[in-house]
Swiss-Prot record:
<comment type="function">
    <text>Acts as a sensor of norspermidine and enhances biofilm formation. When complexed to norspermidine, could interact with the periplasmic portion of MbaA to regulate its enzymatic activity.</text>
</comment>
<dbReference type="Pfam" id="PF13416">
    <property type="entry name" value="SBP_bac_8"/>
</dbReference>
<dbReference type="InterPro" id="IPR001188">
    <property type="entry name" value="Sperm_putr-bd"/>
</dbReference>
<dbReference type="InterPro" id="IPR006059">
    <property type="entry name" value="SBP"/>
</dbReference>
<dbReference type="GO" id="GO:0015846">
    <property type="term" value="P:polyamine transport"/>
</dbReference>
<keyword id="KW-0813">Transport</keyword>
<comment type="similarity">
    <text>Belongs to the bacterial solute-binding protein PotD/PotF family.</text>
</comment>
<dbReference type="GO" id="GO:0042597">
    <property type="term" value="C:periplasmic space"/>
</dbReference>
<dbReference type="GO" id="GO:0019808">
    <property type="term" value="F:polyamine binding"/>
</dbReference>
<feature type="signal peptide">
    <location>
        <begin position="1"/>
        <end position="33"/>
    </location>
</feature>
<keyword id="KW-0732">Signal</keyword>
<keyword id="KW-0574">Periplasm</keyword>
<protein>
    <recommendedName>
        <fullName>Norspermidine sensor</fullName>
    </recommendedName>
</protein>
Length: 359
């Protein structure tokens, strides 16, 4: 959940997919003002929260999903006007697009103050924190003697798991495991280090099952039993267990400084429904609503008043909330230079091209 690079995403394919989505769902800005269109990750809002909002206001909420931050960010860069009233985006993109005056100022929302200052600062003035978490490894407990504790386990893959590993296609997360293996920061701009990481990923490629986001992969592939573990985001294992109706999936944050993601919500300035959109975000930040949402999604809430309402087992779940010491050591997603992004884009393009060319 991080920065974007636009060289390795097929823009034409994305636009075809996006237009199909619009046709199928008849999304347009001529739609009723009693509808809000929200662009977000899969499985990241509780149905009961959407129902409670509709019951209270009469305003419907239409949900549209993206698979990775780069896909969403490229679409935003290339499109003059998007048919979404509200967008979920990483903290880096929130600042980038806020500088372009495409989002509404949200500092006046009353319930914004319910969030911890750390996460408010991460999202800035034109977005509000929605959830946060860490990048780690989702894995099937029945197939492992012990949880994965090293990032090398998804790069230098043990024979039993070869061809069964999922990666992420993202300008930071794709390279992250290899960079940690090299004792480097996942956001390093060292050309030599990035090239070393490329060589590690290239060697791992024959043993990678997919570069598709794990939640999207299991929904779109019938042979989901092939997947043993995947680079993923905290909370994803709960979605996997819900999807498979099992308790086999778990989540591990390997050793080293945790890499933290922050999801923010923003209101599109060209939306005709900015009043309702802001009201919806304020509704989501009510402590009781934020608590319901966090418990359903099984993600870390930035809302300290909501956390006080959550069950003890949620607050003490170390797969959701990092221990304080590890949180203090965490690296929060930050903006990469154009040169860094360009090199990463070339690396990822080469890695995924070689992956797709596998026999």
């Amino acid at each position: 959940m991080t920065n974007f690079c636009n060289e390795w995403v097929s823009y034409s394919q994305m636009i075809k997919r996006f237009l199909s989505l619009m046709v199928l769902n008849t999304v347009c800005y001529q739609a009723s003002a009693l509808e809000l269109n929200v662009y977000l990750w899969e499985d990241t809002i509780a149905p009961s929260v959407v129902e409670a909002w509709h019951k209270k206001t009469g305003v419907s909420v239409n949900l549209f999903h993206f698979d990775n931050d780069d896909e969403r960010s490229l679409l935003m860069l290339k499109s003059v006007q998007l048919p979404f009233d509200i967008m979920v985006l990483d903290n880096v993109s929130a600042f980038i697009f806020s500088r372009q005056n495409v989002f509404e100022d949200l500092t006046a929302l009353p319930n914004r103050a319910n969030n911890d200052p750390m996460w408010l600062q991460a999202c800035g003035t034109h977005a509000v924190p929605y959830f946060w978490g860490s990048v780690g490894i989702a894995y099937r407990k029945s197939l492992f003697d012990k949880p994965p504790t090293q990032w090398s386990e998804v790069v230098d893959i043990a024979p039993a798991h070869r061809g069964r590993v999922g990666m992420l296609k993202d300008s930071v997360e794709t390279l992250l495991p290899a960079l940690y293996m090299l004792n480097a920061s996942p956001i390093t701009d060292s050309i030599d280090t990035l090239r070393q990481a490329y060589r590690l990923l290239d060697a791992a490629n024959p043993h990678i099952l997919t570069y598709e986001y794990v939640l999207s992969y299991v929904r779109s592939h019938p042979q989901t039993d092939n997947l043993h573990m995947a680079v993923s985001y905290s909370g994803d294992h709960y979605s996997l267990n819900r999807f498979f109706n099992t308790q086999d999936w778990d989540f591990s944050v390997p050793e080293g400084r945790p890499y933290l993601w922050v999801d923010c919500m923003a209101v599109n300035s060209v939306s005709p429904n900015t009043v309702q959109a802001k009201a919806f975000l304020d509704f989501l930040m009510k402590p009781d609503i934020a608590a319901i949402n966090a418990e359903y999604i099984r993600a870390a809430s930035p809302n300290y008043k909501a956390r006080a309402l959550l069950p003890v087992e949620h607050r003490e779940d170390l797969s959701i909330y990092l221990p304080e010491q590890r949180l203090a050591e965490g690296i929060i997603d930050s903006e990469l230079s154009a040169k860094n992004l360009s090199l990463r884009a070339k690396i990822i393009s080469s890695v995924t091209y070689q992956y797709e060319a596998k026999p």
